[in-house]
Amino acid sequence: MKIKLHFILLVFFLSSAFIVAQDKDPVIESIITEANENSQLEPLAHELLDVVGPRLVGTPQMQKAHDWAVAKYKSWGIEARNEKWGEWRGWERGITHIDMLSPRVQTLQGMQLAWNPSTSEDGVTAEVITLPENIKDSLDFVKWLPNVEGKFVLVSMKQPTGRPDYNWEEFATEESFEKMKDERDAQSSEWRANLNRAGYNGRSVIGALEDAGAAGIVASYWSRGFGVNKIFSARTKKIPTVDLELEDYTMLYRLAEYGDKPTIRVVAQSKELGRVPTFNTIAEIKGSEIPEEYIILSAHFDSWDGATGATDNGTGTLVMMEAMRLLKKHYPNPKRTILVGHWGSEEQGLNGSRAFVEDNPEIVKNVQALFNQDNGTGRVVNISGAGFLHAYDYLSRWLYAVPRDITQHIETNFPGTPSGGGSDNASFVAAGAPAFNLSALNWSYWNYTWHTNRDTYDKIIFDDVRNNAILTAILAYMASEDDERTSREKIVLPMNSRTGEQRTWPEPRSPQRDGGRN
């Protein structure tokens, strides 16, 4: 009896294996094999991140990236072009050198902020001072303002610790950790209140300091991790603005507090390039049966320039480029057109994708599905239905074709809610197109690489990025081949608990097409 049962089970399993083998899609199998055995991710990452570098809108590096992508797509036999959608302030970063000259000599770790005017070759040398404490009111601050003339002013709060909270939590006593957090919270509250009493906030006070004759602005936007600062743009029009790493910034702050009168020299060589055109890079594999319907692969191409934009959004860019390469090689005649958009100026407000949506209503109207990736190097772990009522019907069908070793990590949320911002999928969702964000595993993204001075090639987890390229290519293939057109029916959004009013679907917003003007 046992022998007979074992024989039946064996036949069952062999039959099941045969059925599975018969069900394997040769296109999907070839995509997986190509991605694993002939991946181009590493050389693409090197060319984009090490050679081209950061991709701040309006810079020569951004233009170089656009041209590089077009050439790369054409080398794969994929039609590609740069589509102009606006203009921006042209600017090019040069060498930044920041040195403390007194009370001792030390080179400081920091950089000029984006779109900041250049200094002379000799730079600017001046004493460093702090903002006053215990400001009574705006009149009190006005009386103090003449003190900034000819001085560098420290405009960020002096952090009480350079150790991130997770390090405290691991090693400190509970009492010490709680004490530090309480003191830091109190210090932060007083810092903001002090500026408010002066009639300003952390941003607006910079203009007042420049107008009062400050020689320059020194900031430090710590990202709550070892050695990481967030790097954005300057708010001064004529004087240098630099961001210093926490260790050097707090040292200068203490020296100024204790009356040691530190002096620094800042040399910041940048170039103003006038008004320059801004682009999206578009590539497409034309559909053979329904070319007027589109699957869109989406990733913003620009970055802030504190580092090289490896995980924001170099990795998203790599995923989409590799997916397109895989599709062109193993699915060269798709049923629907597969288009990839590498958007410009996402960091300043989704400008490139909003411009594409505004300029291409016929394409947007005929989007079968859009897949966007923009939050780091990790494997995709979450996909939301974005508020489309029937998203489960087709997304679950497409995901079923993806290997289990990839989908086992993915949580789905249906029907989900529409995104009003955050990344470029939101531009399409607002226009009613079924656009889905492929949300990635954290890998300490928010503290260590997002908009920081450490967002570099070495932070990429290529195994995860490879999985994401396979996932994206298969989703695009399945969406293209689907016999059914995807539904755009939207959920009824819930009431806003704060206002008591019905929530509404996000509205399309126009891009900023003439950016970077002072």
Identify the residue ranges that each predicted region occupies.
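Bacterial Sec-dependent N-terminal signal peptides
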Residues: 1-23
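N-terminal hydrophobic or amphipathic helices/low-complexity stretches enriched
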Residues: 21-64, 71, 76-79, 285-289, ...
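Noncatalytic luminal/extracellular "stalk/propeptide" segments of secretory-pathway proteins
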Residues: 24-26, 46, 50-185
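Second-shell loop/turn segments in exported
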Residues: 28-36, 50-60, 126-134, 166-168, ...
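Metal-dependent peptidase/peptidase-like ectodomains
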Residues: 105-107, 121, 126, 146-150, ...
